[in-house]
Amino acid sequence: MRRKDRENNSPEFFELVFDKAEIINIAFRDEPFPYCLPFNFGKIENKIYIHCAKEGRKLDLIRAHPEVAFNLAIDIRIDREKYTTYFKSVCGTGQASLVEDPAEKAAALDAIGEKYAALCPRPSPMSLLNRVSVIKIAILSLSGKNCEPRED
């Protein structure tokens, strides 16, 4: 990171951003350009979970190239007088895979529902498990950046 004064790689910072972020943007490897999409997500330990339809482009891309990149940002505020934006962000890389184990799939969907306080039954019913795909991203690297107003 070029701006070492803004770097924040503490586990507490990572947890803060993951807890408060409402959306995660995930870039999948495609040709000639990456394919980047926003998702609701859940996190269990060092794994990110998203859900999607049972077929589609992202699943095809994961099967061909499971390496992904992602980013999350919170506390975004534009200061027009100072021509800057304040934020806390985390960028990372990971290895994506399709979750096949019903227990892990249910836990992932429960984590997503819990994060968004969804009014859905928990534990997730088997009928839901059969209707959706769940993707697991095993986190390989994280990098945090914190741009806050300075006390002058």
Residues of each region from the PLM?
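Short beta-strand segments
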Residues: A21-K54, F70
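Extreme N-terminal tail/first-helix region
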Residues: M1-K20
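Anion-coordinating catalytic cores for phosphoryl-, nucleotidyl-, and glycosidic chemistry
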Residues: D5-R6, E15, R57-D60, F70
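Short, intrinsically disordered, mixed-charge
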Residues: D19, A64-V68, D110, E114-A118
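Short glycine/proline-enriched turns and hinge-like loops at secondary-structure junctions
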Residues: P34-C36, I62-R63, Y83-T84
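Charged, gly/pro-rich active-site loop segments
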Residues: M1-D5, R80-D152
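Solvent-exposed residues in well-ordered beta-strands and their adjoining turns
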Residues: I44, A53, A73, S97-V99, ...
